[in-house]
């Protein structure tokens, strides 16, 4: 009983004991870590918490942060499983802690950061339940809610009323909370590993780049996301435009920043949600309407630049991707794609799809993608275009940036480990053609297949146990290979050989240079195409318009000149 009441720096909290796999885990759900960002604190950095006097009941998940929910496939488990399962509120800055029982001494801590494109997400989803990891690996698991969408990332640079990156400062404050308080829970503040998926992994990699976050953790795990991905960070200019667009849509005057923010602060959060989806003129199906920005405070430069300069925390990282990262985005509106059929698309639909995912790229740029991704040996195969678009979207947005991040990191002599996850869960509600989808390694990391009554296979339970073991080993020792030598050794990823490990229900294998050909295209060739043809369409349109103007001038000039010569002739008659 005494283990479930713990004294934190802000006051006492009461948790609860949960039976897990024949043992016990003590869970503390919904501990506040910041002042609720309400009223005049909306859009501001999180403010630290004052003390409370009685015992805080941390026995149920807190509110989820305000967000738009996914209504694309009502009642369908595949999309609904990611929607918030607690009430939406602006009062949402709470965290959860799972500790093995009896209370450990100096246990390693793993802090989970959820994904959701910086627009959605919550720490209370069943698939993020920390109890299995705590029970099986005897680590302490922590997860926090952070603000998303405009409420978390609206940005007017250097204006403390809405500085941008508020959601990342929320995460950072939760990391500080762990530093100050985790010892009371039996955790070791000097052994803290961040792990996250998608936008959560991009967040983790931003903490690696942010000087203020670096002292607050030890190591990092990035699952299917990184800060150098094309969707992860918005330029200041773009972020400012979106803020102004939002203000305009909501009838707030844009003449004076202070007035504008005051006006936005008075709006109903639901109204902000309805309008924030319209701030990007074209929907790429991967739209991050409001996300991280270079604010000069949390983030001092674009991630690419910081990576290039080697300005990141020197430590070990574990990074990886799934086999079919692109499919999850295609069913949300690429032409010819549906979750209810095989999505065999035509060349024309493939080209239309490219337009959706690369709205600002010239026709020539899109042609270069088609050329590179088409299997010309077998261009009559029905699935070709479907698989090609899956690869294009997955490589460009997830796989190649993650590999590039790992490569840059390892060049400076830091140990990096890379995985390629290729097991399709037998419980996956999405259709077969979608393969090993974005987000579907998470249940294996959190040990959901260990619960007997959930109908995973025995092989999946074994896979999940081995992933948990490797993740926890990495968190404890900076190396996923334990002392026991019965499993395949996971070699270090070096920028030269680029070795990686496959994770599936067979035995893991080591390969080198994942998707080397494709990633060369994205990192080296494609930027050149953009530079040269930048927007060839734009240039061409301007040239044509210019030519028409010139043509008209010429006609005009000719008429004027004829007029002049005829007048001159009539004058010379006198």
Swiss-Prot record:
Glycans are attached at residues 57, 106, 241, 256, 341, 455, 481, 486. The modification Phosphoserine is found at residue 198. Its EC number is 3.1.1.8. The active site is at 198 (acyl-ester intermediate), 325 (charge relay system), 438 (charge relay system). It catalyses: an acylcholine + H2O = a carboxylate + choline + H(+). The keyword Iron does not apply. Keywords: Disulfide bond, Glycoprotein, Hydrolase, Phosphoprotein, Secreted, Serine esterase. One of its GO terms (cellular component) is extracellular space. GO terms for biological process: acetylcholine catabolic process; choline metabolic process. It is found in: Secreted. Disulfide bonds join 65-92, 252-263, 400-519. It holds the Pfam family AChE_tetra. InterPro entries: AB_hydrolase_fold, AChE-related_enzymes, AChE_tetra, CarbesteraseB, Carboxylesterase_B_AS, Carboxylesterase_B_CS, Cholinesterase. Substrate binds at residues 116-117. Detected in blood plasma (at protein level). Present in most cells except erythrocytes. It comes from the Eukaryota. GO terms for molecular function: acetylcholinesterase activity; cholinesterase activity. The keyword Hydrolase applies. Homotetramer; disulfide-linked. Dimer of dimers. Esterase with broad substrate specificity. Contributes to the inactivation of the neurotransmitter acetylcholine. Can degrade neurotoxic organophosphate esters. Belongs to the type-B carboxylesterase/lipase family. This is Cholinesterase. It comes from Equus caballus (Horse).
């Amino acid at each position: 009983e005494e283990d479930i009441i713990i004294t934190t720096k802000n006051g006492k909290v009461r948790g609860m004991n949960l039976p897990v796999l024949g043992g016990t885990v003590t869970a503390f759900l919904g501990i506040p870590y910041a002042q609720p960002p309400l009223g005049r604190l909306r859009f501001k950095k999180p403010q630290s918490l004052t003390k409370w006097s009685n015992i805080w009941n941390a026995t149920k998940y807190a509110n989820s942060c305000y967000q738009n929910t996914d209504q694309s496939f009502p009642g369908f488990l595949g999309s609904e499983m990611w929607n918030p399962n607690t009430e939406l509120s602006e009062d949402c800055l709470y965290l959860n802690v799972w500790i093995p029982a009896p209370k450990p001494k100096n246990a390693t801590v793993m802090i989970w950061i959820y994904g959701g494109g910086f627009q959605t997400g919550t720490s209370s989803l069943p698939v993020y339940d920390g109890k299995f990891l705590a029970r099986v690996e005897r680590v302490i698991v922590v997860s926090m809610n952070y603000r998303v969408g405009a409420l978390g990332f609206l940005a007017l640079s250097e204006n403390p009323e809405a500085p941008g990156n508020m959601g990342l400062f929320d995460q950072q404050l939760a990391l500080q909370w762990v530093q100050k308080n985790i010892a009371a829970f039996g955790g070791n503040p000097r052994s803290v590993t961040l792990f996250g998926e998608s936008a959560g992994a991009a967040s983790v990699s931003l903490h690696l780049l942010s000087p203020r976050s670096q002292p607050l953790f030890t190591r990092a795990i990035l699952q299917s996301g990184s800060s150098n991905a094309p969707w992860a960070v918005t330029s200041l200019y773009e972020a400012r435009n979106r803020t102004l667009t939002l203000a305009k849509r909501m009838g707030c005057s844009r003449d004076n920043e202070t007035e504008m923010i005051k006006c936005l602060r008075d709006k109903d959060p639901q109204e902000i949600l309805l309008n924030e989806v319209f701030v990007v003129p074209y929907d790429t199906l991967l739209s991050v309407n409001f996300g991280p920005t270079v604010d000069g405070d949390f983030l001092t430069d674009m991630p690419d630049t910081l990576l290039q300069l080697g300005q990141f925390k020197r430590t070990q990282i574990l990074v990886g991707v799934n086999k079919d990262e692109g499919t999850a985005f295609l069913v949300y509106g690429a032409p010819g794609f549906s979750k209810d059929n095989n999505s065999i698309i035509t060349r024309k639909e493939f080209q239309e799809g490219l337009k959706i995912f690369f709205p600002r790229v010239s026709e020539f740029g899109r042609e270069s993608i088609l050329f590179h991704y088409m299997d010309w040996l077998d261009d009559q195969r029905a699935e070709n275009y479907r698989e090609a678009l899956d690869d294009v979207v997955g490589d460009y947005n997830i796989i190649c940036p993650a590999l590039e991040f790992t490569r840059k990191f390892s060049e400076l002599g830091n140990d990096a480990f890379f995985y390629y996850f290729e097991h399709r869960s037998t419980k996956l509600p999405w259709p077969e053609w979608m393969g090993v989808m974005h987000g579907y390694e998470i249940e294996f990391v959190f040990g959901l297949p260990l619960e007997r009554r959930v109908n995973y296979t025995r092989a999946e339970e074994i896979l999940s146990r081995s992933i948990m073991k490797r993740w926890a080993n990495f968190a404890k020792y900076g190396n996923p290979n334990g002392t026991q030598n019965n499993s395949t050794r996971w070699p270090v990823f070096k920028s030269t050989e680029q070795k990686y490990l496959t994770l599936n229900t067979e035995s893991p294998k080591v390969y080198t240079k994942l998707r080397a050909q494709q990633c060369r295209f994205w990192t080296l060739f494609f930027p050149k195409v953009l530079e040269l043809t930048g927007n060839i369409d734009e240039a061409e349109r301007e040239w044509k318009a210019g030519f028409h103007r010139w043509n008209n001038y010429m006609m005009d000039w000719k008429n004027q000149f004829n007029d002049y010569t005829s007048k001159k002739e009539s004058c010379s008659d006198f």
